[in-house]
Amino acid sequence: RGYDTLLNDSKYDTHERFYELMETNEHCEGTRDEDIADAYESYFDEIGINCNARLHYSTSEGQRVVDELSNNRAVNLIMYNHRRYKDHSVLALGYIQFKYNGYGYSTYIRIADGWTKDPDRYVWGSCVGTWNYVTVELN
């Protein structure tokens, strides 16, 4: 529903427009969490799609992200103090759960990190620390 119009001429142009709307580096500290949801609403409005974007604090050890993904909704995951990404925002697209014999399970979230061409990387879903996320619902 409307997803074919999300691309702004090219992937590069779309990325650059989000970079502007999120005011990345405008405050000399990267992108502030508070600017991400507004950027989604502004971008979608520019391409003629009405949406409601919302910033959520804490992922409840990743379970809230898994719940969104299970309902077929991509999530903008905001990571802090990650061993590889440090403080970086990525698009969460799916997840895998590994079950252990008698020890529960671990969840890994599939992401598009903007550093590689394909969304084929995973981060541990327990989201160590205070990771936040943004959801976007089309109206």
Q: Each predicted region: which residue ranges?
A:
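Active-site signature of cysteine proteases
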Residues: 62-64, 70-71, 76-139
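Cysteine-nucleophile protease catalytic domains, especially the papain-like/related folds used
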Residues: 1-55
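Extracytoplasmic/secreted proteins, especially bacterial periplasmic and envelope-associated proteins
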Residues: 31, 35-42, 60, 64, ...
